[in-house]
């Protein structure tokens, strides 16, 4: 006769029970190890630029805070006092020919490299877009002379254009088309991307490839007050500069730092000038929402909308 089970144990645990307990106990410790492996940082310049040197009173600093929900990298770092710019390239297995420089935000005092850099790059990598995440030079705390801001802007734009050139130079090895190299950015990084798209490039040496973008993505960008004049300078009859590239703009209605109304006005000016542009204003998200997870159902859809816009702009070819 088969003994009846009483529900009691003899005090011994079998191997499967032990392994289960060990696995559950280790979960909190294992979580940080699941952060995505990121590509290495490489120096942006072979030699530090002598035209626009930016010195810092202290060495480069980094601080970390908890990563936002759904972060592909699992990291959330802010770099400050950056005097030596670097870059990292995310390479998909099957590149579709599109290359994109990503400029994180941080008010030009910080560079939020993960939530506004690597996270988007990892998302785009899954969609076969090659991305270069730029850690550009930050603004020193002691920029007080009247012309210092202009000096800094020239320096940081030089960093962004150098990143574009790197993708163009390495296009054959990266599987890119040199006429499909764009720039995008978040907040201050969006302003940087905008300035590279709107302002003509200082003439590079004869042997240098162009640092002008073929398209631009502006994600809750800072909009300067003179943006209308910048557009007019590039689109006025007789202007020697090439036309303004296609531009994608997105923001949240409740953004208090970079108000959506300024993006709407900027978009209207682009349309009036005949620039190919697309604009999205989401009902929720506030400022600094990165990929948008946890900030609003529609807000979290913006990366897919950006990728679709690249298709509509004939950057990504439909299959």
Can you say where each PLM-predicted feature lies in the sequence?
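Conserved alpha/beta-hydrolase "acid-adjacent" motif
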Residues: 256-262
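Short beta-strand/loop motif that positions the catalytic acidic residue
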Residues: 249-251, 255
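Short amphipathic alpha-helix adjacent to the substrate-entry channel of hydrolases
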Residues: 114-132
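Catalytic nucleophile-loop/oxyanion-hole region of alpha/beta-hydrolase
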Residues: 112-113, 119, 136-175, 295-299
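Primarily recognizes the serine-hydrolase "nucleophile elbow" in alpha/beta-hydrolase
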Residues: 158-242
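Short beta-strand element of the alpha/beta-hydrolase
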Residues: 97-105
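C-terminal catalytic histidine-bearing segment of alpha/beta-hydrolase fold enzymes
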Residues: 264-319
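N-terminal cap/lid segment of alpha/beta-hydrolase-fold proteins
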Residues: 36-95
């Amino acid at each position: 006769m088969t003994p009846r089970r009483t529900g009691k144990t003899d005090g011994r645990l079998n191997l499967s029970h032990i392994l289960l307990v060990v696995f559950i106990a280790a979960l909190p410790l294992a979580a940080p190890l699941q952060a995505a492996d990121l590509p290495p940082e490489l120096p942006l310049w072979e030699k530090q630029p002598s035209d626009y040197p930016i010195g810092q009173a202290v060495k480069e600093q980094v601080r970390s805070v908890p990563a936002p929900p759904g972060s592909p990298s699992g990291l959330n770092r802010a770099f400050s006092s950056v005097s030596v710019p670097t870059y990292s390239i995310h390479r998909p297995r099957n590149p579709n020919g599109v290359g994109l420089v990503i400029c994180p935000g941080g008010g030009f005092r910080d560079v939020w490299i993960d939530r506004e850099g690597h996270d988007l790059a990892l998302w785009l990598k899954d969609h076969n877009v090659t991305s270069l995440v730029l850690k550009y030079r930050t603004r020193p705390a002691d920029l007080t002379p009247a012309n210092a801001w202009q000096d800094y802007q020239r320096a940081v734009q030089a960093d962004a254009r150098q990143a574009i050139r790197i993708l163009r130079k390495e296009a054959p090895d990266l599987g890119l088309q040199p006429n499909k190299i764009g720039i995008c950015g978040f907040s201050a990084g969006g302003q940087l991307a905008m300035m590279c798209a709107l302002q003509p490039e200082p003439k590079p040496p004869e042997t240098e490839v162009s640092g002008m973008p073929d398209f631009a993505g502006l994600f809750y960008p800072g909009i300067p007050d003179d943006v209308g004049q910048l557009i007019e300078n590039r689109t006025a009859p007789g202007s020697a500069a090439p036309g303004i590239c296609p531009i994608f703009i997105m923001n949240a209605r409740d953004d208090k730092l970079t108000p959506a109304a300024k993006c709407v006005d900027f978009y209207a000016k682009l349309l009036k000038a005949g620039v190919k542009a697309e604009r999205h204003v989401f009902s929720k998200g506030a400022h600094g929402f990165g990929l948008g997870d946890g900030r609003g159902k529609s807000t979290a859809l913006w990366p897919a909308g950006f990728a679709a816009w690249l298709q509509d702009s004939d950057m990504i070819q439909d299959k």
